[in-house]
Swiss-Prot record:
NCBIfam families, alphabetized: PRK05416.1
Ligand binding (ATP): 13-20
GO terms of molecular function: ATP binding; GTP binding
Keyword entries, A-Z: ATP-binding, GTP-binding, Nucleotide-binding
Function: Displays ATPase and GTPase activities.
Protein name: Nucleotide-binding protein Sez_0730
A Pfam cross-reference name: PapZ_C
Keyword ATP-binding: yes
Organism for this UniProt entry: Streptococcus equi subsp. zooepidemicus (strain MGCS10565)
Transmembrane segments: none
Lineage: Bacteria, Bacillati, Bacillota, Bacilli, Lactobacillales
Binding residues for GTP: 63-66
SUPFAM superfamilies: P-loop containing nucleoside triphosphate hydrolases
Length: 296
């Protein structure tokens, strides 16, 4: 059995208060997540996790969809408290009755405790039953006035640590406009205005990762000026993206074919950012022209 501590978060609370958004937020923070786990299965699940040697951060949604919820949850929590390898925190999500009714009307779903179809009656019944669990919770969040993004931010602030900062990472990529914009790009920059190495016969078959092409692109005055502006724009906004709870920021730099100018710029940007941020560099279309030639 592993002697590593498992950081366990049980996400619970009122139906409709935002547990789906919450569990997605924990996944973005690097937690192993399970939605709608029956309380009776929790001890066995945790035993299996303890046998592994991996770092454990686990978030489980346990709520009213589990039919025997109230009969089992107290004994399960007692079992967890007795395990020295488990650090338990309970996140309880709440909202006003009127807000929950509004959300149910919007989604046209039925409340799990509304046997007669009256949502408000189900909400009141659930709220009454959850009073003991709410009193045991270390974190109670009222989501009445929170957007999904704001809820993600609250969870990130309360449950991330310095070691979790790696959960925010940067993707720097190059691409060719002729092959289409990257669908997942957050920031797109166009460097097609720069001198094109393609028209230099000696450089045509090389890429922006080759020193000769890199030097050709970067030694032009307009290239250096634009790059300095680009870096000056990006560096100050990265902490703001992280603060907002974004898990991946994709910065895409494009030229015509994605082989020369954009590759050189993306590579330089990645080199300058990687010392301070978790980063992955990729070049979507760097071999696209060669593949096209080979097929023809």
């Amino acid at each position: 059995m592993s002697d590593k501590q498992i950081n366990l978060v049980i996400v619970t609370g009122m139906s409709g208060a935002g547990k789906t958004v919450a569990i997605q937020s924990f996944e973005d923070l690097g937690y192993f997540t399970v939605d709608n786990m029956p309380p009776a299965l929790v001890p066995k699940f945790l035993e299996l996790l303890e046998r592994t040697n991996e770092t454990q951060k686990v978030a489980l949604v346990v709520d009213m969809r589990s039919r025997r919820f109230f009969k089992e949850i107290n004994s399960i929590l007692d079992h967890i408290e007795l395990n020295a390898n488990l650090k338990l925190r309970i996140l309880f999500l709440d909202a006003t009755d009127s807000e929950l009714v509004s959300r149910y009307k919007e989604t046209r779903r039925s409340h799990p405790l509304a046997a007669d179809g009256r949502v408000l009656d189900g909400i009141r019944r659930e709220r009454e039953l959850l009073v003991p669990l709410k009193s045991m919770s270390q974190h109670v969040v009222n989501t009445t006035d929170l957007t999904p993004r704001q809820l993600r931010k609250v969870i990130s602030d309360q449950f991330s640590s310095e070691s979790d900062q790696a959960s925010f990472r940067i993707e720097v990529m190059s691409f060719g406009f002729k092959y289409g914009l990257p669908l997942d790009a957050d920031l797109v920059f166009d460097v097609r205005f720069l001198p094109n190495p393609y028209y230099q016969v000696a450089l045509r078959e090389q890429t922006g990762l080759d020193q000769a092409v890199f030097d050709y692109v970067m030694t032009h005055q307009e290239s250096e000026a634009f790059y300095n502006h680009l870096l000056g724009l990006i560096v100050p906004i990265l902490p703001a993206y992280q603060k907002e709870g974004k898990s991946v920021l994709t910065i895409a730099i494009g030229c015509t074919g994605g082989q020369h100018r954009s590759v050189a710029f993306a590579h330089r940007l990645a080199q300058d950012l990687t010392a301070d941020w978790p980063l992955h560099e990729s070049h979507r279309d760097i071999n696209r022209r060669k593949e096209t030639v080979n097929r023809s």
